[in-house]
Swiss-Prot record:
Pfam families recorded: Ribosomal_L12 (PF00542), Ribosomal_L12_N (PF16320)
Coiled coil: none
The organism's taxonomic lineage, starting at the top: Bacteria, Pseudomonadati, Campylobacterota, Epsilonproteobacteria, Campylobacterales
Organism this protein belongs to: Sulfurovum sp. (strain NBC37-1)
GO cellular component, one term: cytosolic large ribosomal subunit
Official protein name in the record: Large ribosomal subunit protein bL12
Disulfide cross-links: none
Length: 124
C-alpha cells in the first residue's frame, strides 16, 4: 500500500521536538538544504516615503538559558506544553524558537516570564 501525504503528516505530528530536530538535520544532509526560517528585515521607510507596517506577529526565541537552567526549563514547559525531555533539549540547544506567530501582547508576556526565570530571549 502506498504511503500518502496524510500518512506522512500524521507520522510527523506524533514526533517529539527532539525527534523532529533530528529529522530536520537528516533532511538537510540528504538534500543539501537548510531549514532556516525566512526573516524579512524591517527597513526604515519604503522608497515611496510610506511608513513601514507595524509587526503584528512575533516569534519568541530563547537565546540563553541563564545560570539556573531548571527555572528556564519550567518556563519553557509552561509556555510550549512540551514534556520535560523536550523542554530540556530546547533550553540546551539555544537559540530555540519557542512560539511562532503570536500577538505582541502574548510575546511580551512570554518574554517577561522567560526573563523572570533568569533566561534571555528575543522577539522577532
Amino acid at each position: 500500500m502506498a504511503t500518502t501525504k496524510e500518512d506522512v503528516l500524521e507520522f510527523i505530528s506524533n514526533l517529539s521536538v527532539l525527534e523532529l530536530s533530528e529529522l530536520v538535520k537528516e533532511f538537510e544532509e540528504k538534500f543539501g538544504v537548510t531549514a532556516q526560517a525566512t526573516v524579512v528585515a524591517a527597513g526604515g521607510a519604503a522608497a515611496g516615503g510610506e511608513a513601514a507596517e507595524e509587526q503584528t506577529e512575533f516569534n519568541v526565541v530563547l537565546t540563553d538559558a541563564g545560570a539556573k537552567k531548571i527555572n528556564a526549563i519550567k518556563v519553557v514547559r509552561a509556555i510550549t506544553g512540551l514534556g520535560l525531555k523536550e523542554a530540556k533539549a530546547a533550553v540546551e540547544e539555544t537559540p530555540t524558537v519557542l512560539k511562532e506567530g503570536v500577538s505582541k501582547e502574548e510575546a511580551e508576556e512570554f518574554k517577561k516570564q522567560i526573563e523572570e526565570a533568569g533566561a534571555s530571549c528575543e522577539l522577532k
